[in-house]
Amino acid sequence: SCPGIYGLLGNNGAGKTTLLNILTSRLHADAGEVLLDGVPMVDNDAALAQLFMLGEKNLYPDEMRVRQAFEATACFYPAFDIARAKALAARFGLNMKSKITALSTGYRSIYRIVLALTVGAPYLLLDEPVLGLDAQHRDLFYKLLIELYAEHPCCILLSTHLIQEAAPLIGHAIILHQGRILRNAPAEELLAAVHTVSGPAAAVDSYLAGRRPLSASSLGGLKTAYVEGPRPQAAPQGLETGPADLQGYFIALMEEESK
């Protein structure tokens, strides 16, 4: 349910970008249909106007300048806040006079980020939004995204490989693998259903007997495993148990699927 910040997670080729393109009618699904408030999205300009997708594909010609792109966006999205867009461009150091084709990979991402943060659409689909950004600009983006959601709650679908960085923002996780949805639940609920255990390999193996480990790794005589099931209140003697984090859980789940 929306509003909310949804994380769309998956390895390369899992189908994340394909799914986003289907949601925005850039691609047509082989089966099924996309509905918004119970209404089909295909050939529905009113419904599509409620969505804004940030992706690698440019909305405007490469020869257009950033300033001109902002002005064009105001024509298509009445809620677009061009004054705020200019202010954010200044914060990121984005030159409004630059042609889109002249922007570096990082600044192309920044240009798209500024549009997404100010367009005013109730549904934002962000496909790898921080591609090419340095750590400082990524941090600024995450802060601005939280500010946007706090001021104007909307539905944000964030596709990213930087799970550890984005995890604090994600309230609901959708995990894809080879075109299939493996998990689709609140992040807190997913992580409550798995835990880690570590210690001497023999003791860990004994602990895993009768349980379902997702993955395990060994270093010397020590072993660590991700285990499905709630974390026990007290760890067995000689072992340490802990909560799972979203990135570790994702990696463990991918390892389980690759078996």
Which positions does each model-derived feature cover?
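Walker A (P-loop) phosphate-binding loop of ABC-type ATPase nucleotide-binding domains
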Residues: 11-15
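Helix-to-loop junction immediately C-terminal to a conserved catalytic motif
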Residues: 24
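C-terminal coupling/interaction segments
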Residues: 212-215, 219-259
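Catalytic Walker B motif of ABC-type/P-loop ATPase nucleotide-binding domains
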Residues: 124-128, 133
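Conserved ABC transporter NBD signature motif
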Residues: 1, 32-47
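ABC-family P-loop ATPase nucleotide-binding domains
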Residues: 53-112
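ABC ATPase "signature
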Residues: 184-185
